[in-house]
């Protein structure tokens, strides 16, 4: 396994774990404290977070198949950035009530 493959597997596993934790947090701790519309936004954030974390596992597999392919690595970093920017902004939106 290459270092890049190992890196993306690690990032994907951490992202997947965080998505599950945040999904459970929204379903149990936030449910009574936020509006149904905000809960829907939270669920959207979790759904995109999970899908992109799964995509990072695919990127890790592709990095293993094509170890020197810069485009695959770029796709992985863009997916990771998408989790932080898109899902992260939705999480912040719900928590801050903006």
Segments the model singles out, each with a brief description of its role:
Residues 1-98:
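Polytopic transmembrane helical bundles with strong interfacial aromatic enrichment
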């Amino acid at each position: 396994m290459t270092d890049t493959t190992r890196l993306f597997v690690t990032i994907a596993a951490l992202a997947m774990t965080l998505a599950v934790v945040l999904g459970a947090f929204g379903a149990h701790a936030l449910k009574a404290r936020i509006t149904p519309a905000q809960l829907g936004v939270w669920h959207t954030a979790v759904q995109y977070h999970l899908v992109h974390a799964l995509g990072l596992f695919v990127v890790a597999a592709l990095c293993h198949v094509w170890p020197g392919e810069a485009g695959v690595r770029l796709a992985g970093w863009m997916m990771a950035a998408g989790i932080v920017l898109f899902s992260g902004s939705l999480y912040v939106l719900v928590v801050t009530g903006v």
